[in-house]
């Protein structure tokens, strides 16, 4: 299936498809603000969002942010959202999006990439390890 996979930058017309994918991840009701979020990413030089299409249908997306580091020579890239349609998983779509993100991060002079993944997403954990990610033991969050 990955031979038919085409990656491109997301546009506002992708809002409905991305909302559907986020619902699969457990984030319902994103349709009302998805267009404004995609516009914000499009206008942020440190952010990008790609979609993966098969037969002109969006089957996945990945959003990435470049984060400058003061104490290190290289910056790092953070995957903020990464979702593949349940019907398209294990067919190379995620790998294609990740390769797109890695190439872009290298162009931006990043020397590492990170992703936060909920502990219940065991299949995603296996994917990340297979793609060369190492588990990082601590992550703290404070709601504002």
Where do the model's predicted regions map?
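Conserved acetyl-CoA-binding loop-helix of GNAT-fold acetyltransferases
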Residues: 81, 90-103, 130
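Short beta-strand-to-coil "C-cap" segments at the C-terminal boundary of structured domains/repeats
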Residues: 3, 141-144
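Residue-level recognition of the GNAT/N-acetyltransferase active site
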Residues: 67, 85, 118
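Conserved GNAT acetyl-CoA-binding A-motif
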Residues: 98, 105-117
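Acetyl-CoA-dependent GNAT
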Residues: 9-74, 80, 143
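Conserved functional loop/turn residues at catalytic and ligand-binding sites
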Residues: 45, 83, 92, 109, ...
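Conserved active-site alpha-helix within GNAT-family acetyltransferase domains
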Residues: 95, 119-137, 142
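Conserved acetyl-CoA binding element of GNAT-fold acetyltransferases
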Residues: 74-86, 138
